[in-house]
């Protein structure tokens, strides 16, 4: 080991990188690839055009050694915290964690003059707003100010045979005729019409009803009335029929309307198709659709990064179960289009669920009933693990673990109105040394939860220590026979194998999928994949294609795709290629030092600077618009 350290020092491995072969908390990269911060950025800047600015972004001091050791020493005492506090008094505090006050540029900001949708839809009727329309109606003026196309091929036109964005598409040259008409490939359109499409969209009529509060939640009100009358009995196969009061019984109302002699003389009610009693008799637990996913690979519901294009990437690499991003029940009940977009399901997602966040039984139960009759999912998950203050201070997320009475009402209420299994994702607890999961798991089993996913960290802990898999093993025994999935620190097939030995029913992959979405392939094939930089770029290119299909190919769609690509790159840059490591596998808590890859693209992908992520996005989506600003959500580094 001493010889390796000497070689590293001679090859420039010392200096700012400060990486030794055995340094704890740092990824063990081979000596011939390690370098310093200055040489790393000089190498990247050398490829830029002559005359470009070669400033090295300023960066705060490196993390103290004591703080890096805390990643592995879960039982560290409070001395390291005192050392860190004293260190921060001497030097300016470096921004870290979430960037809560980051500048947020909406994609519409980059499209100042937008064409009226009536012109895009090629409708025969004129614009309903007339002169009061705030959009542009002069096509010639729009084309004069429109930026140049980003490429010669339109993903939507090639995939679906028609681009609905017409002349506003940033690749419009691929499908505009000589007179500016939008071309259509009839054969491709006919073929795509027979294929399944993306589901779980929000209907405009339903959106208006939600905004005007005209939606009836009869089943939810019945369930809530049962909850207020007292504790409900434990759900068991013997409980068959939900009790209905006469005023809520549809059969009773019908008999009152046609009762007496007039009922015998009147004509029979015409029927069409089979008559069911789903509105009167709810499904028994044994009649509900079962969620049998034991042993399958579960992609975690990842806020911001777990969007539909990213889930398609993970499905292609072997993910079995997917779940939408966390959706707030109050926003869904208000008909917010952006929140309903989180529920969309691609046809490739064969086992798919949605995750709800809420703090009160009434809103959660009503939202569950709404989703039960409007969208197509295989399960509904309750978020009891969100640690952010915005959710926690309102009583949702992790706070539900300390509000067992409300938690019980939420679970029982939702379970009564849902026809699909109900699952829960939770943490070990709120405080770092006070675990609560082992106490709640038997209760959740009695309340009717079909499956629980346990993240082996508390709210206060966040990612400052390794996940507590021994505690997850203990909870798996307590939860039996209810299946329990484990989550935390899985970045290789060895990590997955060790996790399965704890007795869990399966594993959930979260950050590991962000760092390397091909992790699912590695787990299933039990091998390390030394993926090349060109293959990784192809994955990013596929993501941009999926993003343009999902968010659109106009300026707003392109910039929204770019934004989510950059957020993903803030995680992808932490991956260290297999061929560069001295020891396999890479640990998720090991910080990658400065290193030079086997080619320029591999080095560029290892950069932790947002300016370099922008360069990668420009390879795939063209140049950024003027005034572009990006500050990653989970990284203390900005590009302006």
Curated annotation (Swiss-Prot):
Low complexity: compositionally biased ranges: 1-10
Single GO term (MF): zinc ion binding
Active site location: 386
Residue numbers of Phosphoserine PTMs: 267
Superkingdom assignment: Eukaryota
Binding site for FMN: 301-303, 355, 425, 455, 487-489, 510-511
The protein's required cofactors: FMN
Function: Catalyzes the synthesis of dihydrouridine, a modified base, in various RNAs, such as tRNAs, mRNAs and some long non-coding RNAs (lncRNAs). Mainly modifies the uridine in position 47 (U47) in the D-loop of most cytoplasmic tRNAs. Also able to mediate the formation of dihydrouridine in some mRNAs, thereby regulating their translation.
Protein name in UniProt: tRNA-dihydrouridine(47) synthase [NAD(P)(+)]-like
Species: Rattus norvegicus (Rat)
């Amino acid at each position: 080991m001493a010889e390796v350290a000497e070689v590293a020092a001679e090859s420039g491995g010392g200096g700012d990188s400060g990486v030794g072969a055995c340094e704890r908390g740092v990824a063990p990269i081979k000596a011939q690839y390690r370098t310093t911060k200055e040489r790393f950025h000089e190498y990247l800047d050398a490829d830029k055009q002559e005359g470009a600015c070669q400033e090295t972004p300023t960066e705060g001091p490196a993390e103290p050694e004591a703080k890096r050791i805390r990643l592995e020493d879960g039982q560290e005492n409070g001395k390291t915290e005192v050392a860190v506090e004293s260190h921060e008094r001497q030097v300016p505090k470096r921004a870290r964690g979430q960037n809560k006050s980051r500048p947020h540029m909406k994609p519409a900001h980059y499209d100042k003059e937008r064409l009226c949708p009536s012109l895009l839809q090629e409708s025969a009727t004129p614009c309903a707003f007339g002169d009061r329309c705030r959009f542009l109606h002069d096509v010639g003026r729009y084309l004069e100010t429109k930026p140049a196309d980003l490429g010669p091929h339109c993903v939507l036109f090639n995939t679906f045979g028609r681009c609905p964005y017409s002349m506003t598409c940033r690749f419009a040259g691929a499908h505009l005729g000589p007179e500016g008409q939008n071309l259509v490939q009839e054969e491709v359109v006919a073929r795509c019409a027979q294929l399944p499409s993306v589901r779980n969209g929000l209907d405009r009529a339903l959106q208006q009803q939600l905004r005007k509060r005209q939606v009836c939640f009869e089943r939810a009100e019945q369930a809530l009335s049962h909850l207020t009358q007292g504790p409900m009995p434990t759900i068991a196969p013997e409980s068959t029929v939900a009790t209905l009061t006469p005023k809520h019984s549809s059969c009773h109302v019908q008999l009152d309307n046609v009762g007496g002699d007039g009922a015998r003389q009147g004509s029979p009610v015409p029927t069409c198709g089979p008559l069911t009693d789903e509105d009167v008799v709810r499904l028994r637990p044994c009649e509900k659709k079962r969620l049998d996913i034991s042993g399958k690979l579960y992609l975690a519901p990842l806020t911001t990064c777990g969007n539909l294009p990213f889930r398609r990437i993970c499905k292609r690499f072997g993910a079995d179960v997917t779940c939408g991003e966390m959706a707030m029940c109050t926003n869904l009940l208000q008909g917010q289009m952006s929140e309903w977009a989180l529920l969309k399901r691609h046809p490739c997602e064969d086992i798919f669920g949605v995750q709800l966040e809420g703090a009160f039984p009434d809103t959660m139960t009503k939202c569950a009933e709404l989703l039960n009759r409007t969208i197509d999912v295989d399960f509904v998950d309750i978020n009891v693990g969100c640690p952010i203050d915005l959710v926690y201070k309102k009583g949702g997320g992790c706070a539900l673990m300390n509000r067992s009475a409300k938690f019980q009402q939420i679970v029982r209420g939702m379970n009564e109105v849902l026809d699909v299994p109900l699952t829960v994702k939770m943490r070990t607890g709120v405080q770092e040394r006070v675990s609560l999961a082992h106490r709640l798991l038997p209760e959740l089993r009695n309340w009717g939860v079909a499956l629980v996913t346990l993240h082996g960290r508390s709210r206060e802990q966040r990612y400052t220590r390794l996940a507590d898999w021994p505690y997850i093993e203990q909870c798996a025994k307590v939860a039996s026979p209810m299946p329990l999935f484990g989550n935390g620190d899985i970045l290789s097939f060895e990590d997955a194998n060790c996790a399965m030995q704890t007795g869990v029913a399966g594993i959930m992959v979260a950050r590991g999928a962000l760092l390397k979405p091909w992790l699912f392939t590695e787990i299933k094939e039990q091998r390390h994949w030394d993926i090349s930089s060109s293959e990784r770029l192809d994955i990013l290119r596929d993501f941009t294609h999926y993003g343009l299909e999902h968010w659109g190919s106009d300026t707003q769609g392109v910039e929204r795709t770019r934004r989510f690509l950059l957020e993903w790159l803030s995680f992808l840059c932490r991956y260290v290629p297999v061929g560069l490591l001295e020891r396999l596998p890479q640990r998720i808590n090991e910080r990658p030092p400065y290193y030079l890859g086997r080619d320029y693209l591999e080095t560029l992908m290892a950069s932790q600077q947002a300016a370099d992520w922008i360069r990668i996005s420009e390879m795939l989506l063209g140049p950024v618009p003027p005034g572009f600003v990006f500050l990653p959500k989970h990284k203390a580094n900005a590009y302006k």
